């Protein structure tokens, strides 16, 4: 049985979260994406403390597909440094 992992990311826009989730499922890179939110995030960025509403995305996949999933997220994610 393959090792199953969960990948978590946050995104500032529900439609973008759904677009990424849909692409990952369509490309058969993941079994499931769950999107919840909005959540409130407080974080340090470029020397300051920021706050933002975000959408929480839980991604379920095989460990062997992690690099492909990460690459797709990086290509489609709006953040300079996707979490």
List each language-model region with its residue ranges.
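Positively charged, small/polar-rich N-terminal and surface patches that mediate targeting and assembly
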Residues: 1-83
């Amino acid at each position: 049985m393959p090792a199953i992992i969960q990948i978590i990311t946050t995104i500032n826009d529900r439609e973008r979260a759904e677009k990424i989730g849909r692409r990952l499922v369509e490309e058969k890179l993941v079994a499931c994406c769950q999107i919840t939110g909005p959540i409130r995030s407080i974080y340090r960025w470029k020397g300051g403390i920021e706050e933002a509403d975000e959408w929480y995305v839980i991604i379920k996949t095989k460990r062997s597909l992690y690099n492909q999933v990460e690459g797709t997220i990086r290509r489609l994610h709006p953040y300079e440094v996707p979490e």
